[in-house]
């Protein structure tokens, strides 16, 4: 059950909060306006023959609340290469799509995911994010609901495991394979043991090793797991030297998070073709 404190917050304090804030609703509306996507093609970066393969960070979070089903649907609609999500595990061992380990003010609810059942989480609605008023009936998705968005599409689901868990990884693999997404889905994590475990469960699933910097050690660790293991590295932490190292080692990689045309062009000119973004499109 939701804790007594959480009930007090949800049933008493939140309504008071919004009644006090009601005069400022125009400001809230202003802060939740969608942002216009910035086209790389229109700014001379990439082409249909040699494109940048873009990952939508937590879905297209410029047009819909991050990690919501509408944000992933926008990724498919706008032709993104992949759409990244984050998953956490509920009290009743269901994988759900949310970045933080707890629900927060974006849902006007509070509590740790690991302390809440799926049924309890499904009572929470989005109350913050681009176009939120259009998606007032949206709920935190399950992993299965997220994956269903990509069945029969060209956009790849990209699943980041957000917690240190090993005994429920088979549920992730099963959800992927049951939908025929084995060759389409990507699983990524900072945890090498989780990557190895996923690889052992199904070596056909593509894995991305999340790292800050692309070092010789990180490259060797990824290669040790298998041929279909990429690096997903921080754009801010990697120099041209790091990029050249990865290329010379023949390891595939993607850089996050790139949000300006200038950054994307500089990377493109260096030969980088895979980036993650909040705002760019082709």
In which residue ranges do the predicted regions lie?
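Phosphate-group recognition and catalysis centered on beta-loop-alpha active-site segments
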Residues: 2-282
């Amino acid at each position: 059950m939701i804790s007594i404190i959480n009930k007090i917050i949800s049933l008493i304090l939140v309504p008071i909060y919004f009644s006090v804030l009601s005069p400022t609703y125009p400001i809230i509306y202003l802060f939740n306006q969608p942002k216009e996507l910035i086209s790389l093609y229109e700014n001379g970066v990439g082409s249909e023959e040699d494109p940048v393969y873009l990952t939508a960070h937590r879905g297209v979070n410029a047009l819909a609340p991050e990690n919501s089903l509408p944000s992933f649907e926008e990724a498919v609609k706008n032709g993104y290469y992949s759409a990244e999500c984050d998953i956490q595990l509920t009290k009743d061992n269901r994988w759900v799509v949310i970045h933080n380990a707890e629900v927060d003010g974006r849902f006007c609810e509070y509590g740790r995911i690991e302390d809440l059942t799926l049924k309890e989480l499904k009572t929470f609605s989005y109350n913050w994010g681009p176009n939120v008023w259009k998606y007032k009936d949206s709920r935190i998705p399950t992993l299965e609901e997220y994956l269903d968005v990509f069945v029969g599409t060209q956009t790849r689901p990209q699943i980041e495991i957000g917690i240190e868990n090993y005994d429920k990884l088979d549920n992730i693999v099963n959800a992927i394979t049951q939908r025929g997404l084995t060759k389409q889905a990507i699983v990524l994590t900072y945890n090498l043991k989780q990557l190895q475990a996923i690889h052992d469960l199904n070596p056909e699933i593509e894995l991305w090793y999340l790292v800050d910097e692309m070092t010789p050690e990180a490259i060797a660790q990824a290669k040790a797991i298998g041929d279909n293991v990429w690096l997903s590295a921080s754009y801010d932490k990697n120099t041209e030297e790091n990029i050249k190292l990865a290329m010379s080692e023949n390891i595939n990689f993607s850089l996050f998070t790139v949000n300006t045309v200038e950054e994307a062009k500089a990377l493109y000119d260096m030969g980088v073709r895979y980036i993650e973004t909040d705002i760019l499109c082709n």
